[in-house]
């Protein structure tokens, strides 16, 4: 079980200021979470193979195919700025 002092220490590390009511609330909530984790630790998983995902999924992406659009000008005209045939967007990298 977790106590209020441990909750205060975690709050300090996370740079959070908790009221006494919040300390009590988080003590109860974190205690419940840790109790549940303890129950999970008691499960026998020796016959369960290690997995990275719950279901086996591979390459769910689609092919990236270029498809012409009939009304290109309508799309470009909706942009706040454009440069030739392209959307112009603000520079975000090395903008210093």
UniProtKB/Swiss-Prot annotation:
GO terms for biological process: glutaminyl-tRNAGln biosynthesis via transamidation; regulation of translational fidelity; translation. It holds the Pfam family GatC. It is an enzyme of class 6 (ligase). Its EC number is 6.3.5.-. It comes from the Bacteria. It catalyses: L-glutamyl-tRNA(Gln) + L-glutamine + ATP + H2O = L-glutaminyl-tRNA(Gln) + L-glutamate + ADP + phosphate + H(+); L-aspartyl-tRNA(Asn) + L-glutamine + ATP + H2O = L-asparaginyl-tRNA(Asn) + L-glutamate + ADP + phosphate + 2 H(+). GO terms for molecular function: asparaginyl-tRNA synthase (glutamine-hydrolyzing) activity; ATP binding; glutaminyl-tRNA synthase (glutamine-hydrolyzing) activity. Keywords: ATP-binding, Ligase, Nucleotide-binding, Protein biosynthesis. Heterotrimer of A, B and C subunits. Belongs to the GatC family. Allows the formation of correctly charged Asn-tRNA(Asn) or Gln-tRNA(Gln) through the transamidation of misacylated Asp-tRNA(Asn) or Glu-tRNA(Gln) in organisms which lack either or both of asparaginyl-tRNA or glutaminyl-tRNA synthetases. The reaction takes place in the presence of glutamine and ATP through an activated phospho-Asp-tRNA(Asn) or phospho-Glu-tRNA(Gln). This is Glutamyl-tRNA(Gln) amidotransferase subunit C. It comes from Nostoc sp. (strain PCC 7120 / SAG 25.82 / UTEX 2576). The lineage of its organism: Bacteria, Bacillati, Cyanobacteriota, Cyanophyceae, Nostocales.
């Amino acid at each position: 079980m977790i106590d209020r002092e441990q909750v205060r220490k975690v709050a300090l590390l996370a740079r959070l200021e908790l009221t006494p009511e919040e300390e009590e609330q988080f003590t109860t909530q974190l205690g419940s979470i840790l109790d549940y984790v303890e129950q999970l630790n008691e499960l026998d998983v020796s016959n369960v193979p290690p997995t990275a995902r719950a279901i086996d999924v591979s390459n769910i992406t689609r092919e990236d195919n270029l498809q012409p659009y009939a009304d290109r000008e309508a799309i470009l005209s909706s942009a706040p700025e454009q440069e030739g045939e392209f959307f112009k967007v603000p520079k975000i990298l090395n903008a210093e």
